[in-house]
């Protein structure tokens, strides 16, 4: 032994003795395992024949046997399917999952219930555990089912005429269906006469889809199911594409769609949203613009609320648009109706419809059209009502010295946009004597016959009422718009007062434009005399002077615009 301590190697004989001793211990353990009665038919853990020794049976030690028995029991975990009545799943799960948690704790078996029955009267459950724990779980589940069947009130709650239907609600929509404080699900139950239960807890993991159980008459259950699915669809269609048949309409509300020309969108919204807030507060509705598709000459505003309030808000919006047209000169587009051309309706269904053209400008002038930060092209879009954009990918064989712009809109809008682009690039049309005289804005009509109507006899939006859910309730406007002196028109005019120029500053540009105000005044005087000479049951109000003043303002405005454009081109 001293030699071993000093690190010398042990003799070969001692190594052989150690191996024999270890082998002897292995044989003893194998003999004990083989001597266990209920393991006699099983395969031994260690086969002594591998080492060339026979099996020797030894007395069983109690401690070792108990440990080995526990290991054997751990290996006998199985899975079994068990079915329970679909109508009683809620009773088995219990409030907050208390019942099913108690069953699992008492039996030692894990219970997983399928989320839906797929229309069959029984719901499959998966039981996982030892055979003893599975049997215990079956016994406890059977007790609950028997107690529910024989208990009082069960048949009162679910009779032969009632049906139960479950729909799986996405986890992100559970709160939407329940509502704040359970308000939405309460309204659904009151309106449909069914009972709804959202199964929040149970074996389902957190964040998973939750089943909504609907109990009641078959027809009412189906109606409630459709209403729930409609709420979910509404949430998914939050981009407001298409006319929205929204759930609030069933609760006493509704929505209409009002078309707003592009140039008037900013006017309806107002500075920092002040105007649209004022409209909402005054009418008691909610207004939201649909996303801009970049193509249509109009933007759609969704007005949501009671029908009468929606109509009131639509009327206010139309007043703002008409006021803006009168004030900023866009009224010529609508005023052109009845001047012999019959053009200028803002609606998409106007004569000619929405068109698209390609307009070419020199490459070195492209920056003048776009402007710093896109200011010029935005101004062109606002003033014309058309949509102008630069073609990013020109045709392969196109001239590199030219740039192409795409203009979309009705013919009048396209023509105005072309005129504005020519101003920016200094085109030949800029200095022509009749540059603006050829546009629908300021061109005087030929002497009309007696049946010619005044330029604004039908108002700016003749088709607006038809667009509002197909309910034409609009009243034709006769003569100049009277609302210019009302609150909404004056509000917009007040915003525009700082930008007005002194009349003396407009005198020079006016001299370059032919003055048609006198001709229009004479024309309306003749019309007035002819109308007074004819026998009428009731004489309409005389708008002669008002129309004369209106056309003086039109000539003054476009004369000023032309003068500014000429000065700008001379500076360049």
From Swiss-Prot:
Cellular localisation: Nucleus
Which molecular-function annotations from GO does this UniProt entry contain?
Answer: mRNA binding; RNA binding; single-stranded DNA binding
**Which residues are reported to carry the modification Phosphothreonine?**
76
Recorded hits in InterPro entries, A to Z, give: KH_dom, KH_dom_type_1, KH_dom_type_1_sf
Tissue and organ distribution = Detected in a number of cell lines.
Question: Which PANTHER family does this one have?
Answer: KH DOMAIN CONTAINING RNA BINDING PROTEIN
Please report the name of this protein according to its UniProt entry: Far upstream element-binding protein 3
Q: Which organism is it from?
A: Homo sapiens
